[in-house]
């Protein structure tokens, strides 16, 4: 039992609460009259504290936090999974649930009192556990953060020739440290005529408003989730050492948050604030006016602290190391977190290298995820290549205390494998802020959207030219550089050996269109919006958003500018907009969008290059599984001896110029000549019925000195024609909509467009050419035969390769600007030789990329290989836990959504973090607490019970709904909780209060509502009548029907209850004399007489499934005879299913809108498909209906696909007008309809009606024996992950890859809509016959490869089965084989049908992940009820 929270803590809190209450003012509401009506305005004081709308009053908030302190031992017991959930009376869970949910709605003044009441516990400061625990620094907040300097407009200047404001210093590019209130108080504008100062103030305010965007929880909710879930590093170590897979800790003698150094630093920084000094409004971050001078860095430091606490909880950091990380970050905040981060972080890579070199590491060799050997790796010197000098120099930029501290141990490391790998990951928290890097992207355009030189363009001379629009355009070149000439030959060979992805070019172009933005500029969209609103009213706003999607823009262009070349060229030169990307720890980037005309030319390159590079072994495109299989290449490379090169091309988009694009263009142009391709139609006046689709022009060929060899007539195929027109017009202007210091900024016209359809293809193709050439040269012994004489002159000889190249097997991969290279040296054991060979190879990849004109920054290491943000270190994985943020996001468009969506987005990120965590066990309680804190929705109620909502530009106007909100729903909330909370019988609660003259209703889902088949939050320990039903399920629990099975099993009735219920329903079943049900009823009576006292439903199942299924076709006994659905509902069993009904996205209702204009667009889109494609699809659909009675929905027909993409765009664009308030009204209306849920959800309940029985005992696993050594940072020795990996093994590298196949079929195939619908129809057809399946795939327009892939997906899983749930997130179960094949290794069923077998194996896998300690210990039989078999057997 945890000790009761100390009396001193509560007393300290009480004393601080009194001070807080003395600061409370009431808000002043004045009436003022405008010309038309009287209005009220509320004025807030600039000192003291006030109640605010939609937050609990300050007094009640303090009571909630006081109660939370009184019950903190319970919070910790629930958090460490030591407190059982007693099904009949879950009082402790009920209390913690309510307190956390209310704390999430509390006024932040109470959070400040709570924070200031914490007393630091220094128990971990003095334990001898280097490197995990260290002596921490005492928090000293710098003067510049506590009393920030004033804002200065002199940080910026106006570049008058282009009228753009730029930063004078590096710090001003991002968010500088200054007094935030200074800029909010000034007049600001970027409209025409605004002064320089007004523009600067506008830019500064906008930077601050957008500095943090929330993922799915409010600021207060984030704080509550972080403090309640926090586990100190001592508890984390105990969890990791625990024999229990749940990580339960029963004996706790401390309060974890009092050991957090991150909270201690935050306490010191916030000590003078009466409430959180910033808040989140619809406009973004706003600073409180009653907190004095607040630094702009405060919100950043706040979220950095919360994220740091989560990293300590999962074992990435430790409670004492938090102090040193804070010491450095608070020092950086003196100037600006982000600018200092970029300036100081270079040394961290050297620190990592020093840690690895001085440690006794293990090297894991693997092939295709089969661990072949484990060996010791020798230590290396840190002074041999000057690494020590680089470290000392780099550390000078750090805070002086941190610098001295790191220097005191960095050169005396002598660690074994596990702590060394931990330290190497932990040290990275000094490199990257745990935040999305925000700021005005227009100030950092130089890094992302203006041209960079690379290392200059190589020389080339025209080889072939085409006459177009009166000018000769080169389409092929001579390269005097022999390396480049060889690369051109290699590129030509690659495209010649591959067929274009789409042979019908027009259909192919149409098929790759998405629902993303079309790239039109603001005034074009605004003009269309005005026209459509004038014509259609409120729905015009919706149509304007839909019209600006790529798919609809393409429909309109096909009937307009694509009709003739002149219109096409004119439109291609129109200005387009640019978007932006923000990432963790990286500079903001501009994404330059391209018009649909530009995308047409880009599609030509995409259609030819993509199949060419995918045919090589050097790309991973289309092979992504989301799990450890994606890391195979870096694990293989890093596990080999020698150097590895992780090559990052510096600014690949911005340094890609015509030279680089010409290389790929010449290969594609050559492949598209008429004698090879034929003459297909491709817009611009060509017709699909004609065989003569070509443009007659002239071509001439030159020799290497420029002399013309021959000039002749040339027939340009239409793909070639479109390609060349695009090449002429590819530098159309792009406008970056800034909105900070000016309306927009023009970006460079010389930069390669990052928004082009073929951006990734262009970069990947060049990388693949280079690797393919390198492999070919090694195979042909080129370095020994030609390298010496050719490279001698330029000092680039590869002497080791000249001698040993026949022994070298190149290992490498390319995707976009990311490359990795290494080698396997066959038959060579001398380490010095291997180091020389691999060094040559790393230098050669850099040299060849530089020949292409790119500047490269390779990270060459003996230890690490990195690719696509995944790193292998000596053959074991090192993931990037610090790059995943739980509380903030790039866009922030989910915060403020309804509970189900908010919780889903938070849990989705938690799943990702679980897959990268060193100790994932604490995430089980974090998920439960998140479901309680964020599973809420609050509504403001105005006069006459009308819902209040904000609308208008910048959300400035508050409106009331037209009708009073429903109150009938309140009648069902009859059970009392704490603080006037009321509960209904379905695990939902509500609370009503008035604050700041506004009434608020809080609705929440509680208890086990998220432990469901849709959300998959792990069960806590379940206890029923002193029987432990389950010790809690593992953190790897996935959303599946097995969760319904668990809850049904937990709420089953005992014999006496079941018999009583049976007596109540049996008389209703009889319908007069000679009723066939008589014998059935006799049978049930007999069963009650014979069967034992317990496990009624499961015994019933054995006796031919009477209780839960059919007997000779008669109706089954209602399930409520066997299960207590009152209890099932009370503990939240229906919670998620209710949330899906009640909190439904209003955008789904758009399908009911009558929009003739949209129908016209859809019709035009559908008819732009090739007529033979439409005819084949509709013929297959009709044949299926006639022959098999199957109805194929229009949503999956290829004949209707373009229209379906427009429908998809309709559902995806943001809410408009009244949709927000209608969504809220609908919630309250739906609540009134909650009754007889067990009947409403009969099928979904029936999916859990199965039993499992142990057949035999065994203790053998399928995986490698890694528990004793561990495997990299992610699976420490004897950890839960290591044991689970021994049990389940890695996924089969060459086995069925569900995610990769899904990506091929649905993502690459550009199939719109829900994949489940396609699988459901496919499964239905397969159950009839092979012919039916072929007809379905024809109606869907699937290629033979896609049809085969979809068949594999159907046979592999249960997708497409009605009500079946098995939502696997491969990033959560990153290491493990969780395929149905593995389920078959432990589970079998007597039911022989294929769907039954599949369901058994999938549920078996789900059970294995829920309780691996139980289900991996033997072989099991799974039996289904008749009711379940009936559902599985339906077509």
UniProtKB/Swiss-Prot annotation:
GO terms for molecular function: hydrolase activity; nucleotide binding; RNA binding; RNA-directed RNA polymerase activity. InterPro entries: RNA-dir_pol_reovirus (IPR007097). Residues 604-880 form the RdRp catalytic domain. PROSITE patterns: RDRP_DSRNA_REO (PS50523). It comes from the Viruses. Pfam families: CPV_RdRP_pol_dom. It is an enzyme of class 2 (transferase). Keywords: Hydrolase, Nucleotide-binding, Nucleotidyltransferase, RNA-directed RNA polymerase, Transferase, Viral RNA replication. One of its GO terms (biological process) is viral genome replication. Its EC number is 2.7.7.48. It catalyses: RNA(n) + a ribonucleoside 5'-triphosphate = RNA(n+1) + diphosphate. RNA-directed RNA polymerase involved in transcription and genome replication. Following infection, catalyzes the synthesis of fully conservative plus strands. After core assembly, which consists in recruitment of one capped plus-strand for each genomic segments and polymerase complexes, the polymerase switches mode and catalyzes the synthesis of complementary minus-strands. Belongs to the reoviridae RNA-directed RNA polymerase family. Interacts with VP4. This is RNA-directed RNA polymerase VP1. It comes from Colorado tick fever virus (strain USA/Florio N-7180) (CTFV). The lineage of its organism: Viruses, Riboviria, Orthornavirae, Duplornaviricota, Resentoviricetes.
């Amino acid at each position: 039992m945890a000790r009761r929270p100390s009396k001193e803590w509560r007393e300290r809190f009480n004393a601080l609460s009194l001070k807080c209450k003395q600061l409370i003012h009431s808000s002043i509401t004045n009436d003022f009259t405008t010309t038309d009506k009287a209005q009220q305005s509320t004025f807030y004081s600039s000192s003291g504290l006030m109640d605010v709308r939609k937050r609990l009053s300050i007094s009640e908030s303090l009571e909630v936090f006081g109660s939370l302190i009184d019950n903190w031992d319970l919070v910790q017991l629930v958090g460490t999974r030591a407190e059982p959930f007693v099904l009949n009376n879950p009082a402790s869970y009920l209390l913690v649930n309510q307190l956390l949910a209310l704390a999430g709605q509390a006024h932040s003044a109470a959070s400040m009192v709570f924070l200031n009441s914490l007393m630091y516990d220094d128990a971990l400061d003095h334990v001898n556990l280097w490197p995990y625990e260290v002596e921490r620094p005492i928090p000293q907040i710098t003067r510049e953060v506590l009393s920030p300097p004033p804002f200065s407009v002199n940080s910026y200047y106006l570049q008058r020739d282009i009228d753009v404001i730029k930063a004078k210093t590096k710090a001003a590019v991002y968010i500088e440290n200054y007094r935030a209130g200074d800029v909010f108080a000034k007049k600001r504008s970027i409209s025409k005529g605004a002064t320089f100062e007004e523009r600067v103030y506008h830019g500064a305010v906008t930077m601050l408003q957008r500095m943090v965007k929330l993922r799915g929880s409010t600021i207060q909710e984030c704080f509550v989730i972080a403090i309640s879930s926090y586990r100190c590093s001592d508890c984390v170590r105990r969890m990791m050492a625990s024999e229990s897979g749940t990580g339960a800790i029963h004996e706790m003698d401390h309060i974890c948050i009092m050991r957090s150094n991150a909270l201690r630093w935050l306490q010191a920084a916030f000590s003078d604030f009466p409430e959180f000094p910033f808040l989140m409004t619809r406009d973004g971050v706003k600073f409180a006016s009653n907190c004095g001078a607040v630094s702009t860095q405060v919100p950043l430091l706040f979220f950095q602290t919360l994220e740091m606490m989560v990293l300590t909880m999962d074992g990435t950091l430790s409670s004492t190391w938090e102090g040193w990380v804070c010491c450095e970050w608070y020092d950086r905040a003196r100037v600006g977190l982000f600018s200092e981060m970029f300036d100081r972080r270079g040394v961290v890579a050297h620190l990592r290298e020093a840690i690895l070199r001085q440690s006794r590491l293990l090297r894991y060799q693997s092939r295709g995820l089969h661990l072949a050997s484990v060996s010791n790796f020798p230590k290396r010197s840190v002074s041999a290549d000057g690494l020590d000098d680089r470290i000392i120099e780099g550390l000078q930029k750090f805070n002086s205390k941190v610098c001295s501290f790191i220097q005191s141990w960095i050169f005396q490391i002598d660690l074994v494998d596990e702590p060394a790998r931990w330290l190497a990951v932990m040290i990275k928290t000094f490199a990257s802020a745990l935040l999305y890097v925000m700021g005005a992207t227009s100030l950092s355009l130089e890094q992302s959207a203006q041209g960079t030189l690379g290392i200059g363009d190589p020389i080339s001379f025209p080889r072939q030219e085409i006459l177009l629009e009166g000018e000769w355009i080169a389409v092929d070149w001579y390269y005097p550089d022999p390396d480049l000439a060889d690369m051109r030959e290699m590129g030509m060979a690659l495209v010649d050996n591959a067929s274009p992805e789409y042979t019908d070019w027009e259909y192919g172009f149409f098929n790759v269109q998405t629902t993303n933005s079309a790239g039109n500029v603001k005034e074009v969209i605004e003009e269309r919006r005005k026209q459509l609103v004038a014509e259609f009213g409120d729905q015009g706003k919706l149509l304007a958003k839909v019209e600006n999607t790529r798919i609809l823009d393409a429909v309109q262009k096909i009937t307009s500018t694509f009709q003739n070349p002149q219109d096409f060229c004119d439109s291609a030169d129109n200005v387009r907009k640019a978007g932006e990307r923000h990432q963790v720890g990286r500079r903001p980037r501009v994404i330059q969008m391209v018009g649909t005309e530009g995308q047409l030319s880009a599609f030509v390159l995409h259609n030819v290059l993509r199949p060419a590079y995918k045919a090589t072994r050097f790309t991973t495109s289309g092979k992504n599984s989301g799990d450890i299989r994606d890391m195979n290449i870096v694990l293989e490379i890093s596990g080999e001896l020698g150097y590895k090169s992780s090559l990052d091309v510096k600014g690949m988009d911005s340094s890609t110029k015509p030279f680089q694009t010409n290389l790929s263009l010449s290969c594609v142009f050559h492949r598209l000549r008429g004698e090879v391709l034929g003459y297909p139609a491709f817009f611009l006046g060509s017709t699909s019925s004609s065989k003569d689709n070509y443009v007659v022009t002239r071509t001439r060929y030159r020799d290497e000195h420029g002399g013309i060899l021959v000039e002749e007539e040339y027939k340009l195929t239409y793909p070639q024609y479109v390609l060349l027109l695009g090449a002429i017009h590819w530098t159309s202007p792009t406008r970056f909509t800034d909105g900070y210091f000016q309306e927009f900024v023009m970006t460079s016209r010389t930069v390669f467009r990052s928004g082009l359809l073929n951006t990734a293809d262009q970069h990947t193709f060049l990388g693949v050419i280079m690797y393919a050439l390198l492999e070919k040269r090694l195979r042909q012994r080129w370095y020994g035969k030609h390298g010496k004489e050719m490279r001698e002159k330029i000092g680039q000889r590869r002497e080791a390769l000249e001698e040993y190249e026949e022994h070298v097997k190149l290992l490498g991969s390319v995707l976009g600007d990311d490359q990795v290279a290494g080698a396997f040296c066959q038959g060579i054991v001398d380490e010095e030789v291997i180091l020389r060979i691999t060094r040559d190879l790393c230098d050669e990849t850099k040299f060849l990329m530089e020949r292409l004109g790119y500047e490269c920054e390779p990270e060459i290491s003996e230890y690490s290989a990195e690719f696509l943000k995944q790193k292998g270190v000596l053959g074991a994985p090192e993931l990037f836990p610090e790059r995943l943020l739980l509380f903030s996001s790039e866009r922030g468009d989910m915060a403020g959504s309804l509970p189900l969506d908010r919780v889903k987005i938070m849990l989705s990120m938690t799943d990702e973090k679980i897959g990268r965590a060193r100790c994932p066990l604490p995430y089980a309680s974090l998920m439960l607490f998140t479901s309680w804190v964020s599973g809420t929705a609050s509504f403001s109620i105005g006069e006459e019970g009308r819902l209040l909502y904000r609308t208008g530009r910048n959300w400035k106007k508050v409106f009331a709904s037209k009708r009073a909100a429903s109150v009938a729903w309140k009648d069902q909330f009859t059970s009392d909780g704490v603080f006037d909370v009321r509960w209904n019988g379905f695990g939902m609660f509500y609370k009503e209060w008035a604050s700041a003259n506004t009434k608020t209703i809080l609705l929440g889902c509680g208890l086990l509502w998220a432990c469901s088949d849709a959300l998959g939050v792990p069960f806590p320990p379940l206890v029923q009548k002193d029987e432990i039903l389950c010790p809690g399920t593992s953190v790897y629990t996935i959303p599946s029907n097995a969760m319904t099975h668990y809850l049904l099993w937990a709420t089953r009735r005992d014999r006496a209850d079941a018999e009583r219920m049976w007596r109540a329903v049996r008389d209703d079943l009889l319908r007069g004399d000679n009723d066939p049900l008589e014998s059935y009823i006799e049978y049930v009576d007999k069963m009650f007489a014979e069967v034992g006292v317990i496990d009624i439903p499961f015994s019933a199942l054995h006796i031919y499934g009477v209780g839960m299924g059919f007997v000779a076709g008669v109706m089954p006994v209602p399930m409520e005879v066997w299960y207590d659905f009152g209890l099932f509902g009370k503990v939240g069993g229906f919670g998620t299913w209710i949330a899906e009904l009640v909190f439904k996205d209003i955008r789904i209702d758009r399908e009911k809108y009558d929009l003739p204009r949209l129908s016209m667009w859809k019709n035009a889109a559908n008819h732009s498909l090739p007529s033979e494609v439409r005819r084949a699809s509709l013929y297959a659909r009709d044949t299926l209906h006639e022959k098999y009675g199957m109805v194929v929905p229009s949503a999956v027909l290829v004949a209707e696909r373009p229209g379906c993409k427009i429908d998809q765009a309709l559902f995806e664009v943001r809410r408009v007008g009244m949709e927000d308030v209608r969504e809220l009204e609908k919630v309250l209306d739906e609540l009134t309809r909650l009754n007889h849920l067990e009947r409403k959800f009969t099928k979904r309940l029936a999916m859990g009606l199965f039993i499992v029985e142990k057949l035999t005992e065994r203790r053998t696993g399928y995986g490698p024996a890694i528990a004793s050594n561990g495997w990299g940072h992610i699976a420490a020795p004897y950890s839960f992950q290591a044991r689970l990996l021994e049990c389940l093994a890695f996924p089969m590298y060459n086995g069925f890859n569900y995610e990769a196949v899904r990506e091929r079929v649905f993502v690459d195939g550009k199939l719109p809509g829900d994949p489940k619908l396609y699988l459901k129809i496919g499964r239905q057809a397969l159950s009839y016959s092979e012919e039916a399946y072929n007809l379905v795939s024809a109606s869907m327009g699937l290629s033979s490869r896609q049809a085969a892939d979809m068949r594999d997906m159907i046979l592999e899983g249960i997708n497409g089965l009605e009500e079946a749930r098995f939502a696997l997130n491969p990033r959560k179960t990153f290491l493990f084989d969780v395929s149905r094949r593995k389920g078959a290794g432990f589970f079998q069923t007597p039911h022989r049908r294929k769907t039954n077998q599949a369901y058994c194996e999938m549920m078996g896998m789900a059970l294995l992940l829920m309780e691996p300690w139980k289900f991996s210990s033997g072989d099991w039989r799974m039996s289904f009820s008749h009711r379940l078999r009936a559902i599985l057997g339906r077509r």
